[in-house]
């Protein structure tokens, strides 16, 4: 297993967040809120098998979801933000994450 860190960053305002890997729910939590001082709402740590996966993040209360294919070995940390009405998933944008 390979550790995967998902940093829920900008735009969360008391949301319920659901995270699935390859169609299997791995995380569900309500009340996720971005702490503006640090630009982070929650750090989620999961273990995944090596190889390619599909990450799906949904905000049921906002009726939106985002999806991204990633490689567990080359992308051990991903950032998730809710920006301009959509979920953005990508590499961390703040220095010092690695």
Residue positions per predicted region:
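Terminal leader/tail segments of proteins
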Residues: 1-98
